[in-house]
């Protein structure tokens, strides 16, 4: 069995951001030499997410608006968590909604994604360095 483990690092200039990481993950799959297997892509921070969806700008905007309605950043005093000196309770909730990781099948040496599916890193409390784990296993 072959395996590859890599860490991707992100430091976004904005509090919230969505970064398409599909090409980077595909490159790692090629480097791994795995033809049939699985690829795990996992946000290693509790205010960031990895998810799969369409890479359409309107949809990314809609996510931002929808998530802010569900868990608004302000007023920060509305969250018990923020009474500890933090101001990011909303980011924890946004991550919970968007998910922690994705697992994608590798078939014939390529990510087995649907026609519009792309892998994204979602940042909900940016402006500091965070990592994403990519773990590829298979034959």
PLM regions: where:
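Active-site histidine-anchored catalytic micro-motif
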Residues: 1-139
